[in-house]
C-alpha cells in the first residue's frame, strides 16, 4: 500500500506555506507523513509551488513534483496515483495532521474499493483507493475532481463512520493553525 500526501497547493488562504508551520517543533507535513506511515509500505508526497522548501524538511518519504500544480488539487491526486500504480492507496491532504490510528484501521478493514471515513455524517480523509480504482483514476482528465470521480464509482464506495473529528480538520488559515496548536494534541 502507498500513502499519498497532497502537498502541491499554494496555501492562498493561509498566505504562508502552511505545511511548514510547526506544532511540537515539527512541520505539519511531517505530522501527516507520520500519521499514515505505519499503515503503508511507502509514502509519496506530491509537491508543487513549495517543492524546494518541502524537500528540505521531508526525510522519510518519496517526493514527486507536480508540474501541473497550478491546475488544482486533482492534478496532484493524478501525480500521486501515477506514482502508486499497481498499489492500494491511502490518500490524504498534507494539512490533515492528526487522524487517529483507529480510523485508519477501520478503513483498512472495509470491503469496498473506495473507503471514506465519516465523522458525524461528514466525510473526510484519508480516502482508501483499491489498486483497481487507482488504475481507473489515472485515466481521468486533469480538469476532473476527485469527488466527481468517486461519484462515478458510487457503487464501489463504502462510507465508514469513525469517532474522529480530525478526519475533517484541515489547516486552511492561520486561525485554523492557531486552533490546532491550542486545542489539539499532536
Regions found by a protein language model. Give the residues of each.
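Conserved beta-loop-beta/alpha segment of the NTase-like Rossmann-fold superfamily
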Residues: 70-135
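Conserved alpha/beta core of the MobA/IspD/sugar-nucleotide pyrophosphorylase nucleotidyltransferase superfamily
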Residues: 141-186
Amino acid at each position: 500500500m502507498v500513502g499519498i500526501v497532497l502537498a502541491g497547493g499554494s496555501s492562498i488562504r493561509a498566505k504562508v506555506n502552511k505545511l511548514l508551520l510547526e506544532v511540537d517543533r515539527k512541520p505539519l507535513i511531517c505530522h501527516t507523513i507520520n500519521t499514515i506511515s505505519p499503515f503503508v509500505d511507502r509514502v509519496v508526497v506530491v509537491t508543487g509551488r513549495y517543492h524546494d522548501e518541502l524537500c528540505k524538511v521531508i526525510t522519510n518519504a518519496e517526493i514527486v513534483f507536480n508540474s501541473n500544480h497550478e491546475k488544482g488539487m486533482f492534478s496532484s491526486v493524478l501525480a500521486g496515483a501515477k506514482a502508486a500504480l499497481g498499489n492500494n492507496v491511502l490518500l490524504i491532504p498534507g494539512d490533515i495532521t492528526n487522524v487517529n490510528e483507529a480510523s485508519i484501521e477501520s478503513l483498512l478493514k472495509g470491503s469496498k474499493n473506495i473507503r471514506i471515513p465519516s465523522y458525524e455524517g461528514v466525510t473526510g480523509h484519508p480516502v482508501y483507493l483499491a489498486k483497481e480504482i487507482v488504475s481507473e483514476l489515472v485515466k481521468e482528465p486533469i480538469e476532473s475532481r476527485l469527488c466527481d470521480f468517486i461519484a462515478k464509482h458510487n457503487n464501489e464506495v463504502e462510507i465508514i463512520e469513525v469517532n474522529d473529528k480530525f478526519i475533517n480538520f484541515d489547516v486552511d488559515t492561520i486561525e485554523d493553525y492557531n486552533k490546532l496548536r491550542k486545542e489539539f494534541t499532536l
